[in-house]
């Protein structure tokens, strides 16, 4: 019986957690390209997302004992159009972390971050899970419409970490995603969470 119990524990240990994170932001800010850059996929033929869809990736995170463990992450891509609001709200309810994306060349996408935070509040307590802001398209510095200072002031207001990213060059992408994933993993350890799946 002891041997059987040991085998069962080993099987459980080999199973992986599946965490869920969600991209939010206006249409054409680069949410889909950021996710594909994170997956190391080709950026050709990118189209606007017209429904919530996800990619499944694997990454290593640090456990409390300092050792690495591999987990799976569902990275949900949400549409930025108003008509898909219900889909977005449903996705928020089933996520453990959110990355808010704006385009540094489009001031409106930055101003609308406040709107996206309010949408989160309609579905879930925003203090119950971590956020990361991605200031995207830094490869287009000559067209920059939102300064680093403006973006940092907004992030500081909510105490959200902010990363400057480019899906084209890959700058900041891995760091931003890895920060959010590690934070989500840390915040869910020891919790009973119905949104965490064991595979």
Can you say where each PLM-predicted feature lies in the sequence?
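TRAFAC-class small GTPase G-domain
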Residues: 1-192, 196-199
């Amino acid at each position: 019986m002891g041997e059987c119990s040991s085998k069962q524990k080993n099987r459980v240990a080999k199973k992986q957690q599946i965490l869920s994170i969600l991209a939010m932001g206006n249409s054409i800010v680069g949410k889909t390209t950021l996710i594909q850059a994170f997956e190391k996929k080709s950026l050709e033929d990118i189209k606007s997302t017209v429904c919530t869809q996800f990619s499944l990736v694997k990454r290593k995170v640090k456990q409390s004992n300092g050792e690495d463990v591999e987990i799976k992450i569902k990275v949900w891509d949400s549409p930025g159009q108003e008509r898909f609001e219900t889909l977005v709200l449903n996705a928020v309810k089933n996520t453990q972390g959110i990355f808010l994306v704006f385009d540094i060349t489009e001031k409106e996408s930055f101003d609308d971050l406040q709107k996206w935070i309010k949408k989160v509040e309609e579905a879930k307590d925003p203090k119950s899970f971590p956020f990361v802001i991605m200031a995207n398209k830094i490869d287009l510095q000559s067209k920059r419409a939102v300064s680093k200072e403006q973006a940092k002031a907004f992030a500081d207001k909510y105490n959200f970490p902010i990363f400057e990213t480019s899906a084209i060059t890959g700058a900041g992408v891995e760091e931003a995603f890895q920060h959010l994933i590690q934070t989500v993993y840390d915040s869910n350890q020891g919790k009973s969470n119905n949104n965490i799946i064991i595979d």
